[in-house]
Amino acid sequence: MPDLSDLSRYIEISTNYVDREPAFEDGTPNPNFGKGAYVEVWNDTANKYVRVDNNGVVNGSAILIGTTSRPIRIHGPVTFTQDCVIKGVVEGQGTIYTGRNIHIVGSIKYKNPPDFRSNNPDQADKSNSSRDILALAARGSIIMGNTATFGYYPLNYMKPPFTKPRYDEFGNLVPAYNALEIDETGKPRYQSVYGDATISSISEPISQLDCVLYTNFLGGGQLGTGGGGVTFNGSIISKDEAMVIYSLPLVMNYDPRIRERKISNQPLIDVSLPRTPEIMISSWRDHGLFTRRNFHGAS
C-alpha cells in the first residue's frame, strides 16, 4: 500500500493540480477544464457557495455537509492538513487527503451517480465518465459514525491485539494502531479535533457510502444504526478494519472507474488516488487447450 505519511507530497499535488481534460469521454464539455483543485460548500449567511480551501489546501480542519439542493462541490485533489468531517450529497470528481482523520458522520451520496447497467462495457465507461466520484484518503484513519457513542464496540477492535504493526513502502516498521492513544492534538486517535459534542450534534445513521475509502491505518466505526443495512458504492482499502454493522444487509458494489484500463494503464477517472506501480504483462504465450482428470479418474 502506498504510504501517506509524507503529507507535503499531497499538498504539492493539490497546489499544482490543473485539469487538462477539455471534455469527458461521453463527449460533454468539462466545466472545470483548466481549473485547479477546490472544494466548496453552501453558506446560508452569505447565500452562496464558498470555497473551503486555499489553492487546493485546507490548513487545519473543516466540516463539509451537503444536501440534495446544495451539495458539496469538489474538483481534483484537495488536502486537509488535519481532519475532514463529512456527510451528505456530493457533486463533482475529486479526492480529499487528510493529515489526520476523515470522520464520516452520515451517509454520503452522489448527486449524479454512475449507472453500470449495460451490455456494452465501453459504452458504460463513456456514459459514466462525467458522473460524480469521491475518494477519501486519510493519513490517520477513517472513522465512521458518532464517536460520542463508541463503547466496547467498536473501540475494542481499534487497538492491539486486533490491530497489527506494518511495514511502510520504505521498509520502516509502523506500530500497531491504537485508537485510545493520545496524539499531538491532545485527542485520542479515534476522536476528531472538533470533539465528541460537535460530532454528536451533526451525526446521522450511515446507510449508504458513495465513495472510495483509503487509509494506511484503520477503517471502522458504527454503520447501519438506523436499520435497513449499509450499501458501499465504491470500495474501502485499509490496513485494519473495525466496522461494526448494526443492521443487514451489507452490500458492497465496486466502482471500476478507479482501476487501470486496457493498454492505457490509466483509470477512467483519475482522482489522484495513491497508487503503486501496476503489474505489466510483458509477454503472453498461448499453450492451447488441455484436459485434466478429476479425482475419480474420469476425463
Where are the predicted features?
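Predominantly polar beta-repeat domains that present long G/T/S/D/N-rich surfaces used to bind, process
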Residues: 1-23, 107-299
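Long, low-complexity, polar/charged, intrinsically disordered or flexibly structured peripheral segments
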Residues: 1-69
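Short amphipathic alpha-helical surface micro-motifs
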Residues: 23, 32, 42, 54-62, ...
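Generic detector of intrinsically disordered, low-complexity, polar/charged segments
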Residues: 24, 31-33, 53, 57, ...
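Polar low-complexity intrinsically disordered regions enriched in Ser/Thr and small residues
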Residues: 30, 37-39, 59, 79, ...
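Detector for repetitive beta-architecture
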Residues: 49, 55, 61, 69-71, ...
